[in-house]
Amino acid sequence: MSAFFAPTLRSAPADATIASHQLLMRAGYVRKIANGLFAYLPLGLRVRHKIEAIIREELEAIGCLECTAPVVTPAELWKESGRWYRMGAELLRAKNRLDHELLFSPTAEESFTALVRGDCTSYKHFPLSLYQINAKYRDEIRPRYGLMRAREFTMADAYSFHTDCACLARTYEKFAHAYRAIFRRIGLSVIAVHAHLGAMGGQESEEFMVESAVGDNTLLLCPHCTYAANCEKAVGQRPLPDTHDTHLKDEHEGSDLKTPAAMREVHTPHVKTIEELEHFLHVPAHRCIKTLIYRIDTVPQAAGHFVAVCIRGDLELNESKLEALLRVPSVVLATEQEVYALSGTPVGFIGPVGLAQRAAAAYAARTPAFFPSAAEPASVTSDIPFFSLVADQSVMAMHNAITGALKVDTHLVQVEPGRDFVPDAVADLMLVRAGDRCIHCGAPLYEKKGNELGHLFKLGDKYTRSMHLTFTDEQGVRQFPLMGCYGIGLDRTLASVVENHHDTRGISWPLAISPYAVVLIPIPHTQAPYAAAEALYVQLRTRGVEVLFDDRAERPGVKFADADLIGIPLRVVLSAKTLPRVECTTRCGAHTYFFTQEEASEHIARLLEQLASPESS
C-alpha cells in the first residue's frame, strides 16, 4: 500500500448524508469532482470491474452479445423516436462546430435500433440480444446521495429484438432470471415490482428494488400473495369508510341528497376544499367528486393542452398513472390563472358538468396571454387534444354525488356520472397507500422504501416503428420487430451493497466483489514480521488469492482502522508478538483464527472458500 493510491479520511464530507456516500469517500473508493460527478479511485474501480464481470457472465450465459454504442448521439436519432421533443431538461444537449445537434445519452434505445436496422432485415436474423456497459448522463436537477443519484453513471443496458410476442416474453423471462442471479451473486436481496413505463414507453415494465431506508421509491407489497408494485404503478382497493350516512340532508335547502333526482345547485359560500364541503353539507368525502386540471407538459412547451381529472373526494390522484393514460412524459397542475381562463371559474368550484363546453369556448377565444401555444401552433404535439376530461374508475360507481358547479360559491348536488357528464376516458388513477386492499387476495398492502437497481421493459414496436426498422417475415411481408430493453445501474448497485454491508467501523464487502480478498498487515513494519509477510504474500498470490499488502510505515492502530474502513473480507496479521502463528480475522462477524506460518496459506485459501459459499452470505 505504500505505492497504492487509496487516500482515507477520518471524517466524511459535510454533503455526504447517507452511509454509502460517506464510506466510499472516507475509504478512498471515489472522489467528487463536481456536483453529481465522481471519479473512481483504484479500489472503487476494482469493485466496479468485479460487478461488471458478474454481469457479463450472466448475460452471456443467456446468449446476449456485448458491443458498444457512442455516448454522444446525434439528435436525428432521438427526433426519429420523438424523445428529443418529449424529454425535458434532463437531456444534456450540445452542438458541435458544424452546428450539428448532439446529446449525451441517458439511455440507448435509439442507438441500438439504428445499429440493427442496417443489417437485420430478415426473420432469420432474430431473435437478437445485445448489451453494453457504458457511461450515461442525465442532467439531474438535484444530484444527491453520492453514487445513488449522480449525473454521470455507468449502466449495463441490453436490447433485444424479436419477430413475435412469444419470443419477446421468453427473452424477457431469461433476463429476469439473469438479473436475479446477478444481484444474488453481488450480495443483494432484491424485490421485483410492477413499474411505471415513464418516458421509455412500451407495454410492460418491471423494476428490481433493494430495500433501503433512504430509498427514493415507495413500494406496495402484499403480505399474503406475490403482488408487489412501485407506488407509481400500484393498484388497490380502498373500502368506503363506515359513515352511517343513511339519511343525509342538505340543511341549506331541506331536501334529501340521497334521493335520486335531477341535479341542482347549492349555495356554498367560501367553501373551496373537500374538507370544507364535508363540514358545510355534512357529507363524507367519498360523496364528493374532486376535479383537478392539469397542463400537459411537452417539449417544446405546449401550454395549451389541458386535461381535467375527476376522482372520488377521499382519494388522491396518481400523476404517473395519468401520464401513462395520456401517453405523455409529464403533467403539471394548471395555475389558478390557467384554470380561470379555461373554465371561467376560480379554483375551488371546478366540476366536470359543462366543463368541456367551457373549455371549447375558451379555446375558440384563446389569447397568447393565457395559452402561449396559440401563438405557435406548430410547436404543439398534433395528436394531443386541446382539452379532455378523464375520470378515475371510482367516480363512475358514484351516485348522487357532489361537485363544483363552475360558479363562484356554488356546488352541484345529486350529480349522476354518466348522466350529467361523460368523461372521454375512465381508468384506474388512484394513488395506492398502505392499508389499501390487494386486488388479488384482499389483504391490506404495506409499504417499504426501496432503490431501483435494475429495470426490464417490453417496448413492443415503439422504437422500431418510429425509426422504421423492419424485417421480412416467412411470408415475405414487412414487419416491425418487437423490442425489449433491460438495464442495471452499476454505480447504484455498488452503493447499495455498501448500504447493506457496513457497520460502525466501515464497509464489509461480500467476497465476490471485494477489491481484494485479503489485507496483509506486518507489525512492526521491519524485521521478521515483514519478511514473513512477504513470504506469505507470495504463497497466497501463487494460489490466486488477491492480496493487498499494507507495507506502510504506520502505527498498528492506523492500519487496523483503515482495514476495517476499506472492508476487505479477511485481515491477516503477522506480529512479532504472535509469530510463528499467523492471526486471521474475518471482517464480517469478526471471527479470529490462528495458523502456523507453514500452513497459513492453505488455511487462508480454505477460509476464503467458506466465505465465498452462499451459506456465509
From Swiss-Prot:
A GO molecular function held by the record: proline-tRNA ligase activity
Listed GO biological process terms: prolyl-tRNA aminoacylation
Task: State which Enzyme Commission number(s) the record gives.
Answer: 6.1.1.15
Q: Name one Pfam family in it.
A: HGTP_anticodon
* SS bond partners: none
Q: What class of enzyme is it?
A: ligase
| InterPro entries cross-referenced by the UniProt entry | aa-tRNA-synt_IIb (IPR002314), aa-tRNA-synth_II (IPR006195), aa-tRNA-synth_II/BPL/LPL (IPR045864), Anticodon-bd (IPR004154), Anticodon-bd_dom_sf (IPR036621), Pro-tRNA-ligase_IIa (IPR002316), Pro-tRNA-synth_IIa_bac-type (IPR004500), Pro-tRNA-Synthase_IIa_type1 (IPR023717)
Q: Does the keyword section mention Cytoplasm?
A: yes
Q: Where in the cell is it found?
A: Cytoplasm
Reaction catalysed by this chain? tRNA(Pro) + L-proline + ATP = L-prolyl-tRNA(Pro) + AMP + diphosphate
- Give the record's keywords alphabetically: Aminoacyl-tRNA synthetase, ATP-binding, Cytoplasm, Ligase, Nucleotide-binding, Protein biosynthesis
Stored PROSITE patterns: AA_TRNA_LIGASE_II
The record's Gene3D superfamilies line, in alphabetical order, gives: Anticodon-binding domain, Bira Bifunctional Protein, Domain 2, YbaK/aminoacyl-tRNA synthetase-associated domain
Q: What is known of its domains?
A: Consists of three domains: the N-terminal catalytic domain, the editing domain and the C-terminal anticodon-binding domain.
Indicate the family of this protein: Belongs to the class-II aminoacyl-tRNA synthetase family. ProS type 1 subfamily.
Q: How does it assemble?
A: Homodimer.
Q: What is the protein named? A: Proline--tRNA ligase
Q: What is the lineage of its organism?
A: Bacteria, Pseudomonadati, Spirochaetota, Spirochaetia, Spirochaetales
Which gene name does the record give? proS
